[in-house]
């Protein structure tokens, strides 16, 4: 049988092949045009990012709390220290950089990470400008400040919003005297003895790290050391050193309760601040060369993501049933505490957790001038279940960090809403969030999609 052939013959096949070759060459030409354009866009962003880093370091010369971590070129820090630019000059340079960033907006065809990088850098710079304005004397109300610095505003609550929870606590902790005193008395049975602090924390850290490594790959050599300190307004702090290492300090001014072991080990370590900073350094600074991630300005939107993921990460690493079982089996015995009380202890703690926004209200009223320091401590006692020493410590924290307090509870709620909207793989969504330049305001938008 003679095979069938195209009646149009060989000239048609040649013409068709020629058209395909021309189309392929056109595609290659377009790609070659795009590569230099993308490289140019990246170079522009890198230049703008360097200016941003230098400005953050300059602000740090006027605000000791501002630069939380820096692991970029050492000479940039040295130059900032030598120059000590006046705040007026920093403000001028910040405005100029904002204009330059505005002119460098990537096209809508840019990939998601490029878009996120641009939006992140622009919003972080807005926070630099706001902080400089505050340092030069501008007074902002609580919500104005949190929006300017952290890209978020916490909901407002009244005394009535906490009344139902307080009534439930009254039932769970019956007796005479103020409710906060009864709560404080109840908690005394769960204080970790000072000579047991280190073994309890080590056990908690080992468990948090083990659980994190099952889901998140960390670079070789990552580690942190723990120090016990006094005289601080905070309970724990992660000082990221760069090169995948952290220094974690635990404040022992006040008694430390057994639940705080997992809280601090997760929040400050795995999968919290330590892992967050390690992944930013690895994935964004080293792998992509995004120099803006060599510096962490504390008073910026980055902090809401950092604190929110660190708090939500506790629940990701230790869902309630697993946490209760682990603490009964490991931490209570390590602390030489009675494990049979663990379930009741957490029933009470769960109620007190619902009062967390009372702390925001104390800070809001205090910063807005509606109450003084004593009034803020009184509010924390009555509506937040803070003992007097802890309430006074918290007021010192508010004096130092002001509206930063929203980053813990509002941050956790925003992160929880975002991650739970991403499907059932909480660890996967969590890892992606702490490896990308997301903004607080984008969490609610992305969660709705």
Segments from the language model and where they lie:
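N-terminal maturation segment of proteins
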Residues: 40-449
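Bacterial N-terminal signal peptides
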Residues: 24-33
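Sec/Tat signal peptide C-region and signal peptidase I cleavage site
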Residues: 35-39
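Bacterial N-terminal signal peptides that target proteins for export
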Residues: 4-25
